[in-house]
Amino acid sequence: TVPAMEGTSKGFTDTFDYELYDSPAANDPADGFSFNYGNAPVGDQGQAEEGMAGRPGVTENISFEVDTWRNNDAEQGVNISGLVDGQDVGQLAFTNGVILEDGSRKTGSMEIRWDPSKGATFYSTGLTTNADFTDVDTGAFVGDDGYNFIISARVGGANQDLFIDNLIITAGKPTPA
């Protein structure tokens, strides 16, 4: 958890470097991770690649998700989703595709932005299928300076490693990259 930051109700920009690794000849890579902004309490572990859906007391959230489970599965890929008034808003943006092949290592960076007047932006580099979403409408989602940032991840059967480094979160209206 990154605790609430003043100014995030006006938007934010998040950047970080990542490394994903899957050992060879084991089960498929699993399961994935997400970067979340919402009213989840400090310490909430989230639902990994499913964001914060179904977490007790979480009613407002925007989630930037990377699903690595089941190569070529219909739900595997990168997406933006969220919760508004406790209701799942579904996929706001989605690209289906393989993220991490068995026995491979992916390194790259991610840029995540939310602007209340423009929506959500999610870019990644280094994955087999990258996120490339710009100014996606986030509907009725409203930010709040009291919201926390949660990075949530899980590994099915311990078949994937995730490392995040150089995390920078800047509160305030995002500027284009």
Regions found by a protein language model. Name each.
Residues 1-174:
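Polar, low-complexity loop segments and adjacent catalytic/binding residues used for recognizing
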